[in-house]
């Protein structure tokens, strides 16, 4: 298995209490052991968006109540990591707080959410952020609402992953993108599979050296 020199998630190690399936574990190992051009890795020749699809296929489609909740927990954990970006630029803005309250209630009480809910709360999603980082962070919260509907949950997760890992929603350091990908693999996925939030939220405040210094 690849061991990374730089980052906070440098070794492939799943939580000791993880109960994910053997197929999913094997998929996580496989995608961990690749290098991705999209994530600014030297020698990378793999496509991270294809890895997202590969992992989510092994994770399972949201076709039943438990599988659907797993999607929501995954999206929720990523959204919480992106929330500080919104609060940094717009400390008085409360849409992220509203979404968080809605999701918390949904996880407690369940129920199907209309497909239009996300558009109702974010009618101008393409204009709301003003900066790339906040645009992408708001997109993640928009996607989080979309995961509450089984018809839109799968595509919403793929969009969330793209904005979170290959964008600036969580961290503005290009060198952090692979580390965020690793965090998703070994922290977010096992937790979501067990209907939990990750034990650690990725932080954009974690420092990284310039990309030119990363091998």
Question: What label would you give each PLM region?
Answer:
Residues 2-214:
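Structured binding/interaction patches within domain cores
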């Amino acid at each position: 298995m690849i061991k990374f020199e730089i980052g906070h998630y440098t070794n492939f190690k799943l939580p000791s209490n993880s109960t994910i399936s053997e197929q999913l574990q094997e998929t996580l190992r496989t995608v961990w052991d690749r290098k991705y051009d999209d994530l600014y890795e030297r020698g990378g020749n793999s496509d991270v968006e294809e890895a997202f699809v590969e992992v989510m296929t092994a994770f399972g489609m949201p076709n039943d109540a438990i599988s659907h909740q797993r999607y929501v927990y995954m999206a929720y954990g990523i959204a919480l990591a992106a929330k500080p970006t919104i609060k940094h630029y717009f400390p008085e803005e409360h849409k992220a707080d509203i979404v968080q309250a809605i999701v918390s209630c949904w996880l407690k009480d369940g129920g199907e959410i209309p497909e239009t809910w996300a558009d109702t709360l974010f009618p101008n999603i393409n204009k709301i952020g003003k900066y790339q980082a906040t645009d992408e962070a708001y997109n993640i919260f928009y996607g989080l609402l979309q995961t509450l509907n089984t018809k839109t949950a799968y595509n919403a997760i793929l969009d969330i992953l793209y904005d979170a890992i290959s964008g600036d929603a969580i961290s503005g350091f290009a060198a952090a993108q692979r580390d965020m990908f690793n965090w998703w693999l070994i922290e977010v996925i096992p937790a979501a599979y067990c209907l939990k939030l990750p034990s650690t939220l990725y932080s954009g405040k974690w420092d990284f050296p310039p990309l030119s210094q990363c091998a």
